[in-house]
A protein has these predicted regions:
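Bacterial N-terminal signal peptides that target proteins for export
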Residues: 1-9
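Hydrophobic helical h-region of N-terminal Sec-dependent signal peptides
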Residues: 10-15
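Boundary at the C-terminal end of the N-terminal hydrophobic targeting segment
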Residues: 21-25
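Beta-sheet ligand-binding and adhesion/scaffold domains
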Residues: 27-52, 76-129
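N-terminal, post-signal-peptide region of Sec/Tat-exported proteins
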Residues: 47-74
């Protein structure tokens, strides 16, 4: 094996190990997240409004917080999926659920879906403040 091949192999292994160890680190979602929420429902039609999400506590992949919307504030609890990118949260007094993605360290998407008589779909692009 040539010297250049060995150098390439060492660099490749270093990059692989570095990327693997970073992807195993559970992201921290604590903080206040603010952004525009775009929703659609039969009752309210197309709407865009300001959404505020506060993740108050996180322990490993589990977290809890509150979010504000037109009808008030709700408490929720959620989980970060093993891919360290996707998360889901639910509220006790809600018929739908929220699924999101970590887009950047301080930017997430959070999409809500609810079926049935109050069917609603919407996504928010949120930035941590």
């Amino acid at each position: 094996m040539s010297f250049n091949s060995i150098k390439f192999l060492i660099v490749f292994i270093f990059i692989f190990v570095t990327n693997t160890s970073q992807s195993n680190e559970i992201p921290n979602l604590e903080g206040t997240w603010i952004g525009k929420n775009n929703t659609l429902s039969n009752q309210r039609g197309f709407r865009t409004w300001e959404k505020k999400v506060e993740i108050l506590e996180q322990k490993d992949r589990r977290f809890k917080g509150t979010f504000s919307y037109t009808d008030g504030t709700k408490d929720f609890f959620g989980i970060i999926h093993p891919d360290n990118v996707t998360f889901t949260w639910v509220a006790a007094n809600s018929r739908g659920y929220n699924i999101g993605k970590i887009l950047e360290k301080n930017r997430i998407s959070a999409c809500y879906v609810e079926s049935g008589i109050d069917a609603t779909a919407g996504c928010a692009d949120l930035t941590r403040k």
